[in-house]
Amino acid sequence: MRRDDNWFTEVLEEEGMAFSLRVREKLHEERTAFQHIEVYETEAWGRLLVIDGCVMLTSRDNFVYHEMMSHPALFTHPDPRRVAIIGGGDCGMLREVLKHPGIESVVQVDIDAGVTRAAERYFPELTEANDDPRATLLFDDGVAWIQDQPAGSLDVVIVDSTDPVGVAEGLFGPGFLGQVYRVLGDQGLMVQQSESPILHRDTILERLHGHMRGSGFAPVVTLPYPVVSYPSGWWSATLASKGPHPAAFRESDARAKAFATLYYNADIHRAALAAPEFCKGLLTDQ
């Protein structure tokens, strides 16, 4: 919702809080079969993508989210080659994954082509890798797609979803997580956006950890990171592994990476493994 014609405001009624950005104009609005998509030009945060009234990304700070949802997992796997992205319609995750030269194939499965079309038009910097021959973009149900994949056929699965309501709710459940475990190889990992440790520790995060462990994953580790435009300003990615621990990542490769990042590096990777006292035993899997 907007407080007036010059502001976009996301209100979190249950948390008693709101986040606002001053906007210059609305660039795009459409209602697809799945969700309500809006794009704004803001005064200070570049362009703003909103889905169903919730901030999805801004030009100014999306790099933190996309880098922390991709590179920690890819540098934890010993040799990632086959990757699937479930969701990720803005294609920023696809761009980050394809920076890794060893990647042979990435399949991105998002249910709503409208998000990708909006990103191509208004966030071209995020979609610059869409024509990479290693990339396949599908517009389908990610839960159903995972069920159809052969056992052991993927190295890393990244679940870049909206909040766990509506079309994304099934991506947080034990049925889907069990299927992800099945399609991953022996050293496979999945990473899931897991909301705010401040706002959702006792609801979404605790439940997600339980479902992941119940599906066979160990270790399960949550990496927190800042995203100013998201509720509370503090977000997280949860890595669930069939073997490798994020603390034993390929640190020398991360330090010698041949591609540019704006947030992620080997020191950030290691620092993200440190959990505050109120989250120890949950975020650290100890």
Curated annotation (Swiss-Prot):
GO BP annotations listed: spermidine biosynthetic process
Compartments, as annotated in UniProt: Cytoplasm
Highest taxon in the source lineage: Bacteria
GO molecular function, one term: spermidine synthase activity
Binding site for spermidine: 66, 90, 160-163
Keywords recorded for this protein, A-Z: Cytoplasm, Polyamine biosynthesis, Spermidine biosynthesis, Transferase
Transmembrane segments: none
EC nos: 2.5.1.16
Binding site for S-methyl-5'-thioadenosine: 35, 110, 141-142
Active site: 160 (proton acceptor)
Domain PABS residues, every copy: 5-242
Catalytic function, reaction form: S-adenosyl 3-(methylsulfanyl)propylamine + putrescine = S-methyl-5'-thioadenosine + spermidine + H(+)
Main subcellular location of this protein, as a coarse class: cytoplasm
Involved pathway(s): Amine and polyamine biosynthesis; spermidine biosynthesis; spermidine from putrescine: step 1/1
Listed InterPro entries: PABS, PABS_CS, SAM-dependent_MTases_sf, Spermi_synthase, Spermidine_synt_N, Spermidine_synt_N_sf
Gene Ontology terms: cellular component: cytosol
Complexes and interactors: Homodimer or homotetramer.
Protein family membership: Belongs to the spermidine/spermine synthase family.
Function recorded in the entry: Catalyzes the irreversible transfer of a propylamine group from the amino donor S-adenosylmethioninamine (decarboxy-AdoMet) to putrescine (1,4-diaminobutane) to yield spermidine.
Annotated protein name in UniProt: Polyamine aminopropyltransferase
Organism ancestry: Bacteria, Pseudomonadati, Pseudomonadota, Gammaproteobacteria, Chromatiales
